[in-house]
Protein backbone atom coordinates (compact mmCIF):
# COMPACT_ATOMS: atom_id res chain seq x y z
CA UNK A 1 0.00 0.00 0.00
CA UNK A 2 2.67 2.49 1.04
CA UNK A 3 4.98 1.66 -1.87
CA UNK A 4 2.12 2.20 -4.30
CA UNK A 5 1.12 5.47 -2.64
CA UNK A 6 4.65 6.90 -2.59
CA UNK A 7 5.12 6.00 -6.26
CA UNK A 8 1.74 7.40 -7.29
CA UNK A 9 0.39 4.02 -8.34
CA UNK A 10 -3.24 2.98 -7.93
CA UNK A 11 -6.52 4.79 -7.63
CA UNK A 12 -7.32 4.68 -3.91
CA UNK A 13 -7.99 7.08 -1.06
CA UNK A 14 -4.68 7.44 0.85
CA UNK A 15 -6.40 8.83 3.95
CA UNK A 16 -8.63 5.76 4.18
CA UNK A 17 -5.69 3.46 3.42
CA UNK A 18 -3.63 5.01 6.22
CA UNK A 19 -6.59 4.74 8.58
CA UNK A 20 -6.85 1.02 7.79
CA UNK A 21 -3.11 0.49 8.27
CA UNK A 22 -3.12 2.22 11.66
CA UNK A 23 -6.19 0.27 12.78
CA UNK A 24 -4.62 -3.04 11.79
CA UNK A 25 -1.36 -2.17 13.56
CA UNK A 26 -3.31 -1.53 16.77
CA UNK A 27 -5.33 -4.76 16.99
CA UNK A 28 -4.16 -5.51 20.52
CA UNK A 29 -5.63 -9.03 20.73
CA UNK A 30 -4.20 -10.17 17.41
CA UNK A 31 -0.92 -12.09 17.01
CA UNK A 32 0.92 -10.45 19.88
CA UNK A 33 0.38 -6.85 18.79
CA UNK A 34 -0.78 -5.75 22.25
CA UNK A 35 2.36 -7.12 23.88
CA UNK A 36 4.47 -5.69 21.07
CA UNK A 37 3.08 -2.23 21.79
CA UNK A 38 3.55 -2.61 25.54
CA UNK A 39 6.96 -4.29 25.67
CA UNK A 40 8.45 -3.26 22.34
CA UNK A 41 8.61 -6.87 21.12
CA UNK A 42 6.43 -9.97 20.86
CA UNK A 43 7.42 -12.29 23.75
CA UNK A 44 7.90 -15.94 22.88
CA UNK A 45 5.69 -17.04 25.79
CA UNK A 46 2.78 -14.85 24.67
CA UNK A 47 -0.44 -16.82 24.24
CA UNK A 48 -3.41 -15.70 22.21
CA UNK A 49 -5.95 -17.42 20.01
CA UNK A 50 -4.43 -15.96 16.83
CA UNK A 51 -0.83 -16.74 17.77
CA UNK A 52 -0.74 -20.50 17.21
CA UNK A 53 2.47 -20.39 15.15
CA UNK A 54 4.32 -18.23 17.72
CA UNK A 55 6.96 -16.76 15.35
CA UNK A 56 7.59 -14.13 18.04
CA UNK A 57 10.99 -12.99 16.78
CA UNK A 58 10.09 -12.72 13.11
CA UNK A 59 6.84 -10.96 14.01
CA UNK A 60 8.72 -8.35 16.03
CA UNK A 61 11.05 -7.60 13.12
CA UNK A 62 8.25 -7.53 10.56
CA UNK A 63 6.01 -5.37 12.75
CA UNK A 64 8.87 -2.88 13.09
CA UNK A 65 9.16 -2.63 9.31
CA UNK A 66 5.40 -2.32 8.94
CA UNK A 67 5.47 0.51 11.49
CA UNK A 68 8.11 2.28 9.43
CA UNK A 69 5.92 2.01 6.34
CA UNK A 70 2.98 3.52 8.21
CA UNK A 71 5.21 6.34 9.47
CA UNK A 72 6.40 7.17 5.95
CA UNK A 73 2.86 7.35 4.63
CA UNK A 74 1.67 9.42 7.59
CA UNK A 75 4.59 11.83 7.15
CA UNK A 76 3.81 12.25 3.46
CA UNK A 77 0.18 12.99 4.34
CA UNK A 78 1.21 15.55 6.96
CA UNK A 79 0.06 13.42 9.92
CA UNK A 80 2.99 14.27 12.20
CA UNK A 81 1.61 12.71 15.38
CA UNK A 82 1.00 9.37 13.68
CA UNK A 83 4.36 9.54 11.91
CA UNK A 84 6.25 10.21 15.15
CA UNK A 85 4.49 7.36 16.95
CA UNK A 86 5.22 4.81 14.24
CA UNK A 87 8.79 5.96 13.57
CA UNK A 88 9.41 5.30 17.26
CA UNK A 89 7.76 1.88 17.01
CA UNK A 90 9.89 1.07 13.95
CA UNK A 91 12.95 1.03 16.21
CA UNK A 92 11.56 -1.93 18.17
CA UNK A 93 13.90 -4.23 16.26
CA UNK A 94 16.57 -3.06 18.69
CA UNK A 95 14.70 -4.68 21.57
CA UNK A 96 15.38 -8.21 20.31
CA UNK A 97 19.08 -7.66 19.59
CA UNK A 98 21.22 -9.51 22.12
CA UNK A 99 24.70 -7.92 22.26
CA UNK A 100 26.01 -11.02 24.02
CA UNK A 101 25.37 -13.17 20.94
CA UNK A 102 25.20 -10.45 18.27
CA UNK A 103 21.95 -11.93 16.98
CA UNK A 104 18.29 -11.09 17.10
CA UNK A 105 16.93 -13.38 19.77
CA UNK A 106 13.50 -14.32 21.20
CA UNK A 107 12.63 -12.79 24.60
CA UNK A 108 10.00 -13.70 27.17
CA UNK A 109 7.55 -11.31 28.80
CA UNK A 110 10.04 -10.68 31.64
CA UNK A 111 12.67 -9.45 29.20
CA UNK A 112 14.88 -12.53 29.37
CA UNK A 113 16.46 -13.74 26.15
CA UNK A 114 15.77 -17.35 25.22
CA UNK A 115 18.38 -19.60 26.76
CA UNK A 116 20.45 -22.02 24.66
CA UNK A 117 19.74 -20.00 21.52
CA UNK A 118 21.38 -21.36 18.38
CA UNK A 119 21.36 -19.06 15.37
CA UNK A 120 21.42 -21.93 12.87
CA UNK A 121 18.48 -23.74 14.51
CA UNK A 122 14.97 -23.64 13.04
CA UNK A 123 12.61 -22.86 15.91
CA UNK A 124 8.90 -22.03 16.38
CA UNK A 125 9.95 -18.47 17.25
CA UNK A 126 11.05 -17.65 13.69
CA UNK A 127 8.81 -18.08 10.65
CA UNK A 128 10.32 -20.70 8.32
CA UNK A 129 13.86 -19.44 8.89
CA UNK A 130 16.63 -19.39 11.45
CA UNK A 131 18.47 -16.71 13.40
CA UNK A 132 21.06 -16.18 10.69
CA UNK A 133 18.45 -15.58 8.02
CA UNK A 134 16.20 -13.22 10.00
CA UNK A 135 19.01 -11.18 11.57
CA UNK A 136 19.11 -8.88 8.53
CA UNK A 137 15.37 -8.13 8.46
CA UNK A 138 15.78 -4.44 9.25
CA UNK A 139 15.50 -3.18 5.69
CA UNK A 140 14.34 0.25 6.87
CA UNK A 141 17.39 0.97 9.04
CA UNK A 142 20.45 -0.85 7.74
CA UNK A 143 22.72 1.87 9.16
CA UNK A 144 21.15 1.31 12.58
CA UNK A 145 21.71 -2.44 12.27
CA UNK A 146 25.33 -1.83 11.29
CA UNK A 147 25.73 0.32 14.40
CA UNK A 148 24.24 -2.38 16.64
CA UNK A 149 26.63 -4.93 15.18
CA UNK A 150 29.67 -2.78 15.95
CA UNK A 151 30.34 -0.91 12.72
CA UNK A 152 30.96 -1.66 9.07
CA UNK A 153 33.93 -3.97 9.58
CA UNK A 154 32.08 -6.21 12.04
CA UNK A 155 28.96 -6.13 9.87
CA UNK A 156 30.97 -7.19 6.80
CA UNK A 157 32.52 -10.04 8.78
CA UNK A 158 29.06 -11.20 9.83
CA UNK A 159 27.90 -11.09 6.21
CA UNK A 160 30.92 -13.17 5.21
CA UNK A 161 30.04 -15.70 7.91
CA UNK A 162 26.46 -15.86 6.64
CA UNK A 163 27.67 -17.08 3.25
CA UNK A 164 30.47 -19.37 4.47
CA UNK A 165 29.02 -21.06 7.58
CA UNK A 166 27.69 -24.14 5.85
CA UNK A 167 25.24 -26.62 7.39
CA UNK A 168 26.93 -29.88 8.34
CA UNK A 169 26.29 -33.04 6.37
CA UNK A 170 24.25 -34.41 9.28
CA UNK A 171 21.90 -31.41 9.51
CA UNK A 172 18.32 -32.13 8.51
CA UNK A 173 17.19 -28.93 6.86
CA UNK A 174 13.48 -28.08 6.60
CA UNK A 175 11.75 -28.11 3.24
CA UNK A 176 11.99 -24.34 2.87
CA UNK A 177 15.78 -24.21 3.30
CA UNK A 178 16.87 -24.67 -0.29
CA UNK A 179 19.29 -22.89 -2.57
CA UNK A 180 21.75 -22.72 0.32
CA UNK A 181 24.98 -20.71 0.25
CA UNK A 182 26.21 -21.09 3.81
CA UNK A 183 23.24 -19.99 5.92
CA UNK A 184 21.81 -17.92 3.06
CA UNK A 185 18.70 -19.67 1.69
CA UNK A 186 17.77 -18.33 -1.72
CA UNK A 187 14.85 -20.73 -1.88
CA UNK A 188 13.22 -18.86 1.00
CA UNK A 189 12.39 -15.20 0.56
CA UNK A 190 13.56 -13.67 3.90
CA UNK A 191 17.16 -14.03 2.66
CA UNK A 192 16.68 -12.31 -0.69
CA UNK A 193 17.89 -8.81 0.18
CA UNK A 194 20.93 -9.93 2.17
CA UNK A 195 23.26 -10.30 -0.83
CA UNK A 196 22.84 -6.59 -1.54
CA UNK A 197 23.88 -5.47 1.95
CA UNK A 198 27.57 -5.57 1.03
CA UNK A 199 26.91 -2.25 -0.71
CA UNK A 200 26.23 -0.70 2.70
CA UNK A 201 29.71 -1.64 3.95
CA UNK A 202 31.61 -0.49 0.86
CA UNK A 203 32.24 -3.99 -0.53
CA UNK A 204 30.03 -3.99 -3.64
CA UNK A 205 32.19 -6.57 -5.44
CA UNK A 206 30.89 -9.21 -3.01
CA UNK A 207 27.31 -8.29 -3.86
CA UNK A 208 28.27 -8.66 -7.53
CA UNK A 209 29.88 -12.07 -6.94
CA UNK A 210 26.95 -13.55 -5.07
CA UNK A 211 24.26 -12.06 -7.32
CA UNK A 212 26.00 -13.55 -10.37
CA UNK A 213 26.40 -16.89 -8.60
CA UNK A 214 22.71 -17.08 -7.73
CA UNK A 215 21.50 -16.02 -11.19
CA UNK A 216 23.79 -18.47 -12.98
CA UNK A 217 23.53 -21.47 -10.64
CA UNK A 218 20.14 -21.31 -8.91
CA UNK A 219 17.90 -20.31 -11.85
CA UNK A 220 17.89 -23.00 -14.53
CA UNK A 221 15.99 -23.62 -17.76
CA UNK A 222 14.54 -26.91 -16.55
CA UNK A 223 11.44 -28.26 -14.76
CA UNK A 224 13.32 -27.69 -11.49
CA UNK A 225 14.47 -24.25 -12.56
CA UNK A 226 13.50 -22.47 -9.33
CA UNK A 227 15.36 -23.50 -6.20
CA UNK A 228 12.42 -22.77 -3.88
CA UNK A 229 8.76 -21.86 -3.44
CA UNK A 230 7.63 -19.06 -5.76
CA UNK A 231 5.63 -17.39 -2.91
CA UNK A 232 3.69 -14.48 -4.45
CA UNK A 233 6.11 -14.39 -7.38
CA UNK A 234 9.08 -13.30 -5.26
CA UNK A 235 11.55 -15.84 -6.64
CA UNK A 236 10.89 -14.53 -10.14
CA UNK A 237 10.76 -10.90 -9.02
CA UNK A 238 14.23 -11.21 -7.46
CA UNK A 239 15.55 -12.61 -10.73
CA UNK A 240 13.93 -9.97 -12.94
CA UNK A 241 15.25 -7.11 -10.81
CA UNK A 242 18.70 -8.65 -10.37
CA UNK A 243 19.04 -9.49 -14.06
CA UNK A 244 18.48 -5.80 -14.83
CA UNK A 245 21.27 -4.95 -12.38
CA UNK A 246 19.48 -3.62 -9.30
CA UNK A 247 17.14 -4.61 -6.45
CA UNK A 248 14.86 -2.84 -3.92
CA UNK A 249 16.32 -3.77 -0.51
CA UNK A 250 13.84 -1.41 1.17
CA UNK A 251 10.88 -1.33 -1.22
CA UNK A 252 9.37 1.94 0.01
CA UNK A 253 12.66 3.86 -0.02
CA UNK A 254 12.46 4.59 -3.74
CA UNK A 255 16.03 3.31 -4.04
CA UNK A 256 17.33 0.23 -5.85
CA UNK A 257 20.71 -1.18 -4.83
CA UNK A 258 23.03 -1.91 -7.74
CA UNK A 259 24.16 -5.51 -8.17
CA UNK A 260 25.44 -6.87 -11.48
CA UNK A 261 23.48 -7.05 -14.76
CA UNK A 262 22.89 -10.24 -16.72
CA UNK A 263 22.22 -8.78 -20.19
CA UNK A 264 24.20 -6.46 -22.49
CA UNK A 265 21.17 -4.17 -22.72
CA UNK A 266 17.76 -3.92 -21.09
CA UNK A 267 15.04 -1.39 -21.85
CA UNK A 268 12.02 -0.59 -19.71
CA UNK A 269 9.23 1.06 -21.69
CA UNK A 270 7.39 3.08 -19.07
CA UNK A 271 3.75 4.13 -18.81
CA UNK A 272 4.80 7.78 -19.05
CA UNK A 273 6.15 7.17 -22.56
CA UNK A 274 9.82 7.25 -21.57
CA UNK A 275 12.36 4.44 -21.76
CA UNK A 276 14.84 3.52 -19.04
CA UNK A 277 17.90 1.74 -20.43
CA UNK A 278 20.61 -0.35 -18.78
CA UNK A 279 23.72 -1.02 -20.86
CA UNK A 280 26.53 -3.45 -20.04
CA UNK A 281 28.01 -4.40 -23.43
CA UNK A 282 30.93 -6.42 -22.05
CA UNK A 283 28.97 -8.45 -19.50
CA UNK A 284 29.49 -12.22 -19.54
CA UNK A 285 29.72 -15.11 -17.09
CA UNK A 286 33.32 -14.04 -16.50
CA UNK A 287 32.83 -10.27 -16.63
CA UNK A 288 30.60 -9.93 -13.57
CA UNK A 289 32.34 -7.02 -11.86
CA UNK A 290 31.35 -3.39 -12.36
CA UNK A 291 34.46 -1.33 -13.04
CA UNK A 292 32.71 2.00 -13.50
CA UNK A 293 29.20 3.40 -13.87
CA UNK A 294 27.69 6.26 -15.85
CA UNK A 295 24.24 7.78 -15.61
CA UNK A 296 23.18 9.72 -18.69
CA UNK A 297 26.79 9.74 -19.86
CA UNK A 298 28.23 11.18 -16.63
CA UNK A 299 30.28 9.30 -14.00
CA UNK A 300 28.05 7.93 -11.25
CA UNK A 301 29.41 6.78 -7.89
CA UNK A 302 26.35 5.89 -5.81
CA UNK A 303 25.54 2.28 -4.92
CA UNK A 304 21.89 2.73 -5.89
CA UNK A 305 19.58 4.31 -8.42
CA UNK A 306 16.27 5.95 -7.62
CA UNK A 307 12.71 5.48 -8.78
CA UNK A 308 12.77 9.05 -10.10
CA UNK A 309 15.84 8.32 -12.22
CA UNK A 310 14.16 5.27 -13.72
CA UNK A 311 10.92 7.13 -14.45
CA UNK A 312 12.83 10.01 -16.04
CA UNK A 313 14.00 7.65 -18.79
CA UNK A 314 17.65 7.69 -17.76
CA UNK A 315 20.40 5.55 -19.28
CA UNK A 316 22.55 3.56 -16.85
CA UNK A 317 25.83 2.25 -18.27
CA UNK A 318 28.15 -0.31 -16.67
CA UNK A 319 31.74 -0.97 -17.68
CA UNK A 320 32.20 -4.65 -16.84
CA UNK A 321 35.34 -6.68 -16.19
CA UNK A 322 36.56 -9.98 -14.79
CA UNK A 323 38.60 -8.40 -11.98
CA UNK A 324 36.86 -7.04 -8.90
CA UNK A 325 37.22 -3.37 -8.02
CA UNK A 326 37.85 -3.04 -4.28
CA UNK A 327 37.46 0.08 -2.16
CA UNK A 328 41.23 0.64 -2.00
CA UNK A 329 41.65 0.77 -5.79
Regions found by a protein language model. Give the residues of each.
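Active-site core of glycosidic bond-cleaving carbohydrate-active enzymes
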Residues: 8-91, 95-277, 282, 308, ...
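Short, basic, low-complexity termini and linkers enriched in Ser/Thr/Gly/Pro
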Residues: 325-329
